């Protein structure tokens, strides 16, 4: 199962921006391929995404990252056994030699890392989720379906980035997807009836110019009920306000509402919403380095609401360990391109599970047809996945792959519903 050659190319993501695709060819003739995603709202502690700059593709080209794969990263792993993922990733990171993968680019390293695992699974003739997770990989994730987009993901007046539904009362993943999809179609009718546009944002959710952030919750609840479901029982609400994007000079600027909140006021804001609405999960409710604020929020509502660190933890075991040690948050969002290798992503998931933190496998706003994260969610029995709305083929690709996996597992498939929540 030795690696014979590694090639890369520049392809486009769902926003029409260049990204890296890598192919790992084995001496047996099997090939693994992977396309890396890209985020719009990125944490400052993420692995570096290498872009070319200049005028080509408005500076977003990745030709240098592609060259790094073919001229440096690929040659470093040629001849190695593709099934030795830890050794492969260590070799890739040794070529880079920087803490944030700033020399080769996290996008270059990750493309090769993921493609290697796919190549190994192909040669062994096993599904990717089984290769990564073994015989106990059987838990289908509860989808966090992003139905209303705001913030950096949409050109509208909504400050907060994602308003999601979670079908926690569904018996299976297949039914959960139906619950969420029916709510998506119901929401379109609700928005139209209120005179709002039904254009969609980067992740396939609607991006209406609502009168306030709270109106997003109100239209979601109406859509859930009109779809025939009970809010809080069949379908709950999850939020990703991504407030690092709103944090300026030590305060949180809710521009659309003309309000500026202190950390203490932001904590009270979320506690109030959690009291009045069926909100079961809040991601990045405070800024990525507002550790004191995070601690206060966790103390206040962490016993009843899943508090997810995305920009806070950036899929980094070291930052997660700090959160564990200081009682900050109770769940981690896992984005493979934040840390830049499969091994480090798996390490973060293992650390979270060891300390009873929830795990949510996530896409990025710039995605592709690559469905790797669907297999990763099942492989790690993560229990939850964020991969957008019920529209745009780059999002649907992940849902369809999960449907295939559930079908293949048959009676062995597990859907945890509410039990998946931290």
Swiss-Prot record:
Keyword list, A-Z: Cytoplasm, Glycolysis, Lyase, Magnesium, Metal-binding, Secreted
Cofactor(s) of this protein: Mg(2+)
Cofactor note: Binds a second Mg(2+) ion via substrate during catalysis.
Binding site for (2R)-2-phosphoglycerate: 161, 335, 364-365, 386
Gene Ontology annotations for the cellular component aspect, listed alphabetically: cell surface; extracellular region; phosphopyruvate hydratase complex
Catalytic activity as recorded in UniProt: (2R)-2-phosphoglycerate = phosphoenolpyruvate + H2O
Top EC class for this record: lyase
Biological-process GO terms, alphabetical: glycolytic process
Record-annotated active site: 203, 335
Family matches, as SUPFAM superfamilies: Enolase C-terminal domain-like, Enolase N-terminal domain-like
MF terms (GO), sorted A to Z: magnesium ion binding; phosphopyruvate hydratase activity
Pathway(s) of this molecule: Carbohydrate degradation; glycolysis; pyruvate from D-glyceraldehyde 3-phosphate: step 4/5
Entries under Pfam families matching the protein: Enolase_C (PF00113), Enolase_N (PF03952)
Binding-site list for Mg(2+): 240, 283, 310
Gene3D superfamilies referenced in this protein's UniProt entry, alphabetically: Enolase-like C-terminal domain, Enolase-like, N-terminal domain
First-listed, main subcellular location of the protein, grouped into a coarse class: cytoplasm
Top-level taxon of the source organism: Bacteria
Compartments where located: Cytoplasm; Secreted; Cell surface
Alphabetical list of NCBIfam families matching this protein: eno (TIGR01060)
Role played: Catalyzes the reversible conversion of 2-phosphoglycerate (2-PG) into phosphoenolpyruvate (PEP). It is essential for the degradation of carbohydrates via glycolysis.
Protein name in the entry: Enolase
